From Swiss-Prot:
Localization of this protein: Secreted
Tissues expressed in: Expressed by the venom gland.
Entry annotated with the keyword Transmembrane: no
GO biological process entries: modulation of receptor activity in another organism
Cystine connections: C3-C24, C6-C11, C17-C41, C45-C57, C58-C63
Name recorded for this polypeptide: Long neurotoxin MS2
CDD domains the UniProt entry points to: TFP_snake_toxin (cd00206)
Keyword Iron part of the UniProt annotation: no
Keywords associated with the record: Acetylcholine receptor inhibiting toxin, Disulfide bond, Ion channel impairing toxin, Neurotoxin, Postsynaptic neurotoxin, Secreted, Toxin
Organism: Micrurus surinamensis (Surinam coral snake)
InterPro entries: Snake_3FTx, Snake_toxin-like_sf, Toxin_cobra-type
Length: 64
């Protein structure tokens, strides 16, 4: 599995997920500097936090 890893809306960077991390993850939230994005490989889909705008977990290459 490969997942996007950059903190931008348009993302060309991907990484191969290590063993045990078979979910691609993307979280968006607002800070005083504007919208922030986090993308990576995870073992479990985290819960949506109170400050989060959106949360995406998926299991296809570069789906985040």
């Amino acid at each position: 599995l490969t997942c996007h890893t950059c903190p931008y809306n348009t993302c060309a960077n991907s990484e191969t997920c290590p063993a045990g991390k078979n979910i691609c993850y993307q979280k968006k939230w607002e800070e005083h500097q504007g919208e922030r994005i986090e993308r990576r490989c995870v073992a479990n889909c985290p819960k949506l936090g109170s400050n989060d705008k959106s949360l995406l977990c998926c299991r296809r290459d570069d789906c985040n």
